[in-house]
Amino acid sequence: MVRRRVLLATFPAQGHINPALQFAKRLLKAGTDVTFFTSVYAWRRMANTASAAAGNPPGLDFVAFSDGYDDGLKPCGDGKRYMSEMKARGSEALRNLLLNNHDVTFVVYSHLFAWAAEVARESQVPSALLWVEPATVLCIYYFYFNGYADEIDAGSDEIQLPRLPPLEQRSLPTFLLPETPERFRLMMKEKLETLDGEEKAKVLVNTFDALEPDALTAIDRYELIGIGPLIPSAFLDGGDPSETSYGGDLFEKSEENNCVEWLDTKPKSSVVYVSFGSVLRFPKAQMEEIGKGLLACGRPFLWMIREQKNDDGEEEEEELSCIGELKKMGKIVSWCSQLEVLAHPALGCFVTHCGWNSAVESLSCGVPVVAVPQWFDQTTNAKLIEDAWGTGVRVRMNEGGGVDGSEIERCVEMVMDGGEKSKLVRENAIKWKTLAREAMGEDGSSLKNLNAFLHQVARA
């Protein structure tokens, strides 16, 4: 029997690579081979980190193309030119690959690689979008460009869109806020126009039916398919206890003392974990406020602070003024295995930027959240966490758009102090952890949805 082969065209950022690799592993388990298509920069970083030491599983191969930025985009680089070069060079590479490799029967692409769908269409290869944000966010974008722009732009405190809960302006994706440059809205419009080029576009979403039942059915024009949570099996259904990482880290985890060993010394549900993802960089003044808030809580904490380097690769961050006190009370690392941390019994709460991967991971591990959203989908994710699922609280920004240390303290205590709100948040966190695992279980909705999708791939 000839095995099917799906090509995964994946944007070279950790937030896209992690769910794409996990999706690839699920395809492999179902008997479908995978070609992982990404940039040279991402491929090199993935190949050089410890997570890649075990090698590729059978049926998975990597194809890397040069986007002109093989050493990555510098912190002060031209993002617009970067995306333009990515599209031009990536399209050419994918076109040649599909022309010369007739084994590929289906293309699945990241939304920042929407051009991959256009190339697939030219090559008469069917495609689907792998959406790595909540279905709710895709619905908001869709309705904005399909009749609801005036209502959303009006800045009302109660924006009502079809089949979605009421939204206020601060909970919209930041691409739709008045202060965001128009080119970002146009970029998202182009992504949706790519989907509109299909008769009934398929969108694979890193969510599950019970989590977003209304959003998954809100757009008649598209077929939204919940296939998540896309996280390693050891932290979800337990089908493969050895699968403890995504397998494609762009950054090495900290070698200075083992985070898990440190957590082993702490009481159950006592530690505050603080991480703002692989991209976000706060100014020093904001970092000082976060530090003050953690010290005021008086609880042990694990704080992941990425090393910040300038265009010449030199470290440029200054030490926090309270670094000595912070190191006495908690542990600061430059990188760690987030899932191992979230799954540890000592974890009591997660202070996060609310990137969707982090949101899904905390939900799947049953960890309450303090939401500190900054941009993109994070603001909507925070709304869902606080109001729809009840698994956390969202910080209140000060007049300057930052977060005071006292607000960090207030929110951490709200989910950690054992009071009525704390108990409710923890009960909800456990409930959604159970539902997430059920979704990927043997009779779960996501597994059924994935199998139905693969049946369609087989007929392609």
Swiss-Prot record:
The keyword Transferase applies. Residues 1-22 form the signal peptide. Optimum pH is 8.0-8.5. GO terms for biological process: anthocyanin-containing compound biosynthetic process; pigmentation. An anthocyanidin binds at H16. UDP-alpha-D-glucose binds at Q338, H353, W356, N357, S358, E361, D377, Q378. GO terms for molecular function: hexosyltransferase activity; quercetin 3-O-glucosyltransferase activity; quercetin 7-O-glucosyltransferase activity; UDP-D-glucose:delphinidin 3-O-glucosyl-5-O-caffeoylglucoside -O-beta-D-glucosyltransferase activity. The active site is at H16 (proton acceptor). Keywords: Glycosyltransferase, Signal, Transferase. Pathway: Pigment biosynthesis; anthocyanin biosynthesis. It catalyses: an anthocyanidin 3-O-beta-D-glucoside + UDP-alpha-D-glucose = an anthocyanidin 3,5-di-O-beta-D-glucoside + UDP + 2 H(+). The keyword ATP-binding does not apply. Catalyzes the glucosylation at the O-5 position of anthocyanidin 3-glucosides to form anthocyanidin 3,5-di-O-glucosides using UDP-glucose as sugar donor. Anthocyanidin 3,5-di-O-glucosides are molecules that are responsible for pigmentation. Also acts on anthocyanidin 3-O-(6-O-malonylglucoside). Much less active with hydroxycinnamoylglucose derivatives. No activity in the absence of the 3-O-glucoside group. Belongs to the UDP-glycosyltransferase family. This is Anthocyanidin 3-O-glucoside 5-O-glucosyltransferase 1. It comes from Perilla frutescens (Beefsteak mint). The gene is PF3R4.
